[in-house]
Swiss-Prot record:
The gene is Tgfb1i1. Homooligomer. Interacts with PPARG. Interacts with TRAF4. Interacts with CRIP2. Interacts with HSPB1. Interacts with ILK. Interacts with LIMS1 and LIMS2. Interacts with NCK2. Interacts with NUDT16L1. Interacts with PAK. Interacts with PTPN12. Interacts with TCF3. Interacts with TCF7L2. Interacts with VCL. Interacts (via LD motif 3) with GIT1. Also interacts with GIT2. Forms a complex with ARHGEF7. Interacts with AR/androgen receptor in a ligand-dependent manner. Interacts with CSK. Interacts with PTK2/FAK1 and PTK2B/PYK2. Interacts with SLC6A3 and SLC6A4. Interacts with NR3C1. This is Transforming growth factor beta-1-induced transcript 1 protein. Phosphorylated by gonadotropin-releasing hormone-activated SRC. The modification N-acetylmethionine is found at M1. SMART domains: LIM. A motif (LD motif 3) lies at residues 157-168. It comes from Rattus norvegicus. Residues 41-52, 135-154 have a biased composition (Polar residues). Residues 83-136 are annotated as: Interaction with PTK2/FAK1. Signal peptide: none annotated. InterPro entries: Paxillin_TGFB1I1_LIM_dom1 (IPR047075), PDZ-LIM_domain (IPR050604), Tgfb1i1/Leupaxin/TGFB1I1 (IPR017305), Znf_LIM (IPR001781). It comes from the Eukaryota.
Length: 461
């Protein structure tokens, strides 16, 4: 830094002389001897001994330009005239430009040797190797002699030099997260570089180590939590633990539809995870009514499975109560509908017979329905008369057949007298006027009424 300050002050002095004196006359540039080579002076510093100024010393410790002895560059005697001062200023400016060029290339080489693009272990090894040997100087013959550099070109050279120094300062400050550590000495000898494969492998290992340490400082765990049950690779970061194994969250998938199951419920079948949809669709029993998978409660009846809301009467759709259900051809019915549809019918009321019944006339009857079909009177003594398939009492039976006595209205079961299209008991076939029996079989008829001969003549003469 002291040399750079000296260069800047000399340049300012030369510029001020040129501005005061005007345009000088042209003169051939003086042949100058090249500046002495720069030597590399390694500096071993310790974090404990370096204080607040240790960082600045460490920044610029690698480039040290020795001051040239006074005998090599003698001081020119002062000129009395303005042309002499101007010529001396141009010579001094040429010398400064040559020194700037040599310094720029040497500083650039030094920076690139210490901070390569990889910024990893390879760069550190090269820096350690550079401590054991001096930097190769660039001969002055390789650089063409500058032809009349102006103040503007010198300023541009200084700008490029300052930019290089700024990059050097930024790169040197980036990895400094703690106290400066002494550089590790590389065991490789000069002239025997390591193979590229080993260098790349070491750089990759160093990069992974730095990445893991950085994640650890940020609170992110980097230790492997086991092998993934799907890809069989180590797990670092988030992990899903299920089925006795660890999984990457993106690898814990449904075996059926391949959707991610992390953070959601799942079912296990034969050691494989399934989402609820795939599990119920593949392995749940089917409802006997809607043929859909049963997910929750289930009713088992008639050799199949049912949703509770679907196990109901197939006729009325009502759920079964405490009275249970009846089965017909594999289908459940409530008691009312089953009896209504399939119970035997009463011949009298055509209703289903639920309890006691009477079997008569090749049919079934409710006890209350087995009565005379004319007067609806129950049969006394359990006896009845049948006419045209209908149960009748005795009176209505004879009435239907015409075997009732026309006088008393009672059935004629024994001897009878048939006259006037009717039947009579023998004792009840009498004259309508005198009421004497007409036993002789001779009588007269008037208005469908029988009369004896004397009464008929007396009345109707």
């Amino acid at each position: 830094m002291e040399d750079l300050d000296a260069l800047l002050s000399d340049l300012e002095t030369t510029t001020s002389h040129m501005s005061r004196l005007g345009a000088p006359k042209e003169r051939p540039p003086e042949t100058l001897t090249p500046p002495p080579p720069y030597g590399h002076q390694p500096q071993t510093g310790s974090g404990e001994s370096s204080g607040a100024s240790g960082d600045k010393d460490h920044l610029y410790s690698t480039v040290c330009k020795p001051r040239s002895p006074k005998s090599v560059a003698p001081v020119a005697p002062p000129f009395s005239s303005s042309s002499g001062v101007l010529g001396n200023g141009l010579c001094e400016l040429d010398r400064l430009l040559q020194e700037l060029n040599a310094t720029q290339f040497n500083i650039t080489d030094e920076i690139m040797s210490q901070f390569p693009s990889s910024k990893m272990a390879e760069g550190e090894g090269k820096e350690d190797q550079s401590e054991d040997k001096s930097i190769t100087t660039v001969p002055s013959s390789t650089f063409p002699a500058p032809s009349k550099p102006s103040a503007t070109s010198a300023t541009q050279e200084l700008d490029r030099l300052m930019a290089s120094l700024s990059d050097f300062r930024v790169q040197n400050h980036l990895p400094a997260s703690g106290p400066p550590q002494p550089p590790a000495v590389s065991p490789t000898r000069e002239g025997c570089p390591s193979p590229p494969g080993q260098t790349n492998k070491g750089s990759l290992d160093t990069m992974l180590g730095l990445l893991q340490s950085d994640l650890s400082r940020r609170g992110v765990p980097t230790q492997a939590k086991g092998l993934c049950g799907s890809c069989n690779k180590p797990i670092a970061g988030q992990v899903v633990t299920a089925l006795g194994r660890a999984w990457h969250p993106e690898h814990f998938l449904c075996r059926g539809c391949s959707t991610t199951l992390g953070g959601s419920s799942f079912f296990e079948k034969d050691g494989a995870p399934f989402c609820p949809e795939c599990y119920f669709e593949r392995f749940s029993p089917r409802c006997g009514f809607c043929n859909q998978p049963i997910r929750h409660k289930m009713v088992t009846a008639l050799g199949t499975h049912w949703h509770p809301e679907h196990f109901c009467c197939v006729s009325c759709g009502e759920p079964f109560g405490e009275e249970g259900f009846h089965e017909r051809e594999g289908r459940p019915y409530c008691r009312r509908d089953f009896l209504q549809l399939f119970a035997p019918r009463c011949q009298g009321c055509q209703g289903p017979i639920l309890d006691n019944y009477i079997s008569a006339l090749s049919a079934l009857w409710h006890p209350d329905c087995f009565v005379c079909r004319e007067c609806l009177a129950p049969f006394s003594g359990g006896s009845f008369f049948e006419h045209e398939g209908r149960p009748l009492c005795e009176n209505h039976f004879h009435a239907q057949r015409g075997s009732l006595c026309a006088t008393c209205g009672l059935p004629v079961t024994g001897r009878c007298v048939s006259a006037l299209g009717r039947r009579f008991h023998p004792d009840h076939f009498t004259c309508t006027f005198c009421l004497r029996p007409l036993t002789k079989g001779s009588f007269q008829e008037r208005a469908s009424k029988p009369y004896c001969q004397p009464c008929f003549l007396k009345l109707f003469g």
